[in-house]
Amino acid sequence: MDSAAGGGGLTAIRLPYRHLRDAEMELVSLNGGTPRGGSPKDPDATHQQGPPAARTTTTRKLVLACMVAAGVQFGWALQLSLLTPYIQTLGIDHAMASFIWLCGPITGFVVQPCVGVWSDKCRSKYGRRRPFILAGCLMICFAVTLIGFSADLGYILGDTTEHCSTYKGSRFRAAIIFVLGFWMLDLANNTVQGPARALLADLSGPDQCNSANAIFCTWMAVGNVLGFSSGASGNWHKWFPFLMTRACCEACSNLKAAFLVAVVFLLFCMSVTLYFAEEIPLEPTDAQRLSDSAPLLNGSRDDNNASNEPRNGALPNGHTDGSNVPANSNAEDSNSNRENVEVFNDGPGAVLVNILTSMRHLPPGMYSVLLVMALTWLSWFPFFLFDTDWMGREVYHGDPNGNLSERKAYDNGVREGAFGLLLNSVVLGIGSFLVDPLCRLMGARLVWAISNFTVFICMLATAILSWISFDLYSSKLHHIIGANKTVKNSALIVFSLLGLPLSITYSVPFSVTAELTAGTGGGQGLATGVLNLAIVVPQIVVSLGAGPWDALFGGGNVPAFALASVFSLGAGVLAVLKLPKLPNSYRSAGFHGFG
């Protein structure tokens, strides 16, 4: 879900293939290549295999080159806010709705690093990153179109012929098409996200890292705001009435139109990026053992071996390339064997094996970071899955499969939830500027702990608001189905307040990891890859367990949110007691999120 949000995009949380600050996060090749940042030892080899001179991309081109981030994030915001409610209108029970999110963390963990390695070695005349960005964006367009028209396609394939305004049963053909499109969308998001970040790293000069990261995050924020605004609008069916069909009523046509707008916006952003991102094609002799984007290590043994190998020269942006230069004629003879080994090491299975086996080489203090990170995401992901559904059910007392008034109330609640996510994104953007000074003032450990305590309070507040809302509704103080104004406004405040701890979650853990591994000589990449494991495993657990857990207590979203508050409380306590104390000279490691 980048994914991510934010953020949000997982969108599984998408792990960047290369941090924009080399001093903080040194990413090493999957094959155990040399760390980036080494100086060339052979001037002749540098001249032969590296580009002739360093260059600096203008700020204008950097802004335009990473515009695709806004297009991807637009679709991710719609996915995050609308698709859990929509799948329930197709007849998938609330207890099973969370299962559709399984693909996001899996593809984020396996596909994204592999795509990063493959793009490193891509020899297309159009560059290393742009072919993957193009392919991923086209996949996104196809996937969201499939999702938007799933009800119509199901109708064509044999679902009920009864009008959607009166039919309350299941539409399994439409649901199958929806799930296929949803999983393809997760796969496509992860295909684009990494090469887009790597492209930005390729284009930015040594002194442009901070500004480049800020530009990328700004585009993500723009995409979030536009996407959640689109999801909050209930007028798409009025502006595009031809999208309403016998199988697709108001809520469906609103979603369909929003996704079609997302397609147009993404194609525009992608075209701008592809045009202004001037890549230098990779020569065949340069394609060996590049390490721009692989967040993995083979282990300390490979690091020791790699330290004795020569390194070649500068990349176009002034950074040094970590690919190895043959030191003698024997190296050339071994090229074919090495490439055969790399084909195996670049595979999805090898990615998982490398990360799992490399956990033995984690630096001291990382295990407590992983534990706190896992509990943090066990508390966050139920909210990401069911936030708008909670607003529609518990606050507005709607039902996606109820009578006409109940469905209308549910749709209104979902749109109000999307507006709450819009407010959340605004606060998240503001909070991202406050994280650095807060960490310098109080220390990263305490800031991370406070963010988890804030999530605990907010998740507990959702349970309390649900109880108050149900009590008011049951006491018949309302003669029509809908939300109490005070409860609704309080819910929007909770959505907004969660933006600040979310900005901390998207940045501080990665900076703590960078600080703990700063002197390990390449261990940063290993630790960051394992940190991603502490994100995706909780997402898989929640995807599998949240729906059945809610069903165990009679349905609704309160059980999952209440359990999330327990996890966040535990994460806060462990952060205070177990996290290593770090100096207050905090340095941001960049923005990480769903999108």
UniProtKB/Swiss-Prot annotation:
Keywords: Cell membrane, Glycoprotein, Membrane, Sugar transport, Symport, Transmembrane, Transmembrane helix, Transport. Responsible for the transport of sucrose into the cell, with the concomitant uptake of protons (symport system). May also transport other glucosides. It is a multi-pass membrane protein. This is Sucrose transport protein SUT4. Residues 29-55, 291-340 are annotated as: Disordered. Pathway: Glycan biosynthesis; sucrose metabolism. It is found in: Cell membrane. It comes from Oryza sativa subsp. japonica (Rice). Homodimer. GO terms for molecular function: sucrose:proton symporter activity. SUPFAM superfamilies: MFS general substrate transporter (SSF103473). Residues 83-97, 152-173, 235-256, 387-417, 469-491, 547-556 are extracellular. The gene is SUT4. Glycans are attached at N403, N484. It comes from the Eukaryota. Residues 320-334 have a biased composition (Polar residues). Residues 1-61, 119-130, 195-213, 278-365, 439-447, 513-525, 578-595 are cytoplasmic. One of its GO terms (biological process) is sucrose metabolic process. Belongs to the glycoside-pentoside-hexuronide (GPH) cation symporter transporter (TC 2.A.2.4) family. One of its GO terms (cellular component) is plasma membrane. InterPro entries: MFS_trans_sf (IPR036259). Widely expressed. Highest expression in sink leaves and lowest in germinating seeds. Pfam families: MFS_2. The chain crosses the membrane at residues 62-82, 98-118, 131-151, 174-194, 214-234, 257-277, 366-386, 418-438, 448-468, 492-512, 526-546, 557-577.
